Each structure stands twice: as C-alpha cells, then as structure tokens.
C-alpha cells in the first residue's frame, strides 16, 4: 500500500497519508497526529496546495479542496457528472461529521463512562441514522451514486491512496475521515 512508517525514540509509527490537513491541527482525526500531540513531539509539516493527476480521461493539475475539484468535474465531464458528485458528497457529509466527532484515542468504547457516552451520543444524534454506513465497504456507497467512469476512478484512486486497496476493500470510516478533510482543506 501507500502507508508511511518511521521509527523515532524507540517508537515505530505507521500511518497512511493525509491528503489535506492531516497533522496540522489539534484535535485532528489523524491517529499519527494525535499520538504526536500526546507525546508533545513537533514535526515539520510540509503542506502542498495541489497535485498533478494522470487519468485515462484526462491529465491536469488540481488544487486541493472541494471547489477546484467541482470546477474540474464540470470542465471535464459536464453538469450531469457534477450532479452525481454532489449527490455522493451529500451522502458522505453525515459520515464525515460522525467521524470528526468521535474520539480516536481518548478512550476505548468498552471504557466509556456514562457522561462520556451521553456527550458522544448528543454529538452523533443529528447523523445517527447514518452510523450503519460506516461499516460498509466504500465502493458500495460510491457506486450507488457515481455512474461516471472518471468519478469512479477518482474515488478508487483516493481509496488506494488511503488504504492501498480498491474502494470495495476500503473501510468507509477511513474514507469519511479523508472526506472530512476534503470539506475543510485548510
């Protein structure tokens, strides 16, 4: 896959890439970022604002974030593909909100006390009906909304960049984390 690993002070770290904000903010959903924060370790973060994309349908430079990508969809594939993408994103947003509200390292689910459970439930309540989708393979959700080959290839690429696997073998929770950063690229 595309995971990164390194050793430091006797610890071994393995983490998939973060395509956008990743390690930069306190309270982020990057497991590596949270560990570094807990260990009070600072690492130099090099942000990039775009990347070159080589696809069967097109080759192009793309800035990070939702707006530049929406513009590129319209340019390359037209309004129908953009409508597909918007429907897909509308389905993914509640999953991304759920992921962004869940504590990754604070406690394990078995050890949540009553107050923590209540606080977590109130945060998740607006999107609770979507929680079951986090267990699905991401390809199942993507193919429900995306018929355009470019969009399917794009989501398959993003899945590979996160997990080293196809969208059908990638966990929806991992992709919801990526898309949470997609919605907030800075």
Which positions does each model-derived feature cover?
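Fold-independent oxyanion-binding glycine-rich loops
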Residues: 16, 158, 171-176
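Generic low-polarity alpha-helical segments
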Residues: 20, 43, 142, 172-175
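Short, contiguous strand/loop micro-motifs
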Residues: 19, 125-126, 186
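A short mid-domain helix/strand-loop element embedded in enzyme catalytic domains
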Residues: 28, 32, 169-175
